[in-house]
Amino acid sequence: MKKIVLIIAFIFSGMPHTNGQEKETYTLIVKISGLKSNKGHILAGVYNSEIGFLKNEYKGDVVEIKEKRATIIFKNIDAGEYAVSFIHDENKNNKMDTNFFGIPKEDYGCSNNAKSFLGPPKYEDAKFMLSENKTMLIEL
């Protein structure tokens, strides 16, 4: 009897432990179209809070442009509220170039195609809920 208990314990000790509390994560695919050129690359970020929007991304990526389009795939994102932004970094200096007045020289965009008005787009206009895998289209 002791042998059987030891064998069963040995078998179960090699099995992965799950507590039923694992969070499900999702994939967010962002497809950008309407870019002016294939020059440079796209700097994209996912933000999970209004505080730090456009400054401190939750997840980020850099992708190449093909046929004036780009696709960014963000994996392993928890369910919740997010916003996406990107810039078309034409000269690959990894920042948004602006003129003397602070107006962007390079194209940019946000989720929900949120627009800027006398300043950057607002988190409130760009936010969306993620509760399943999602594909988002952003057109310039």
For each feature predicted by the language model, list its residue ranges.
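Surface-exposed loops/turns
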Residues: 37, 78-79
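Short, ordered, surface-exposed loop/turn motifs in non-cytosolic proteins
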Residues: 37-45, 50-52
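Extracellular beta-sheet/turn segments enriched in Thr/Pro/Gly and aliphatic residues
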Residues: 105-140
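A short, amphipathic beta-strand motif
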Residues: 26-34
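Acidic, glycine-anchored loop motifs typical of Ca2+
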Residues: 90-97
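Exposed aromatic-hydrophobic patches
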Residues: 70-76
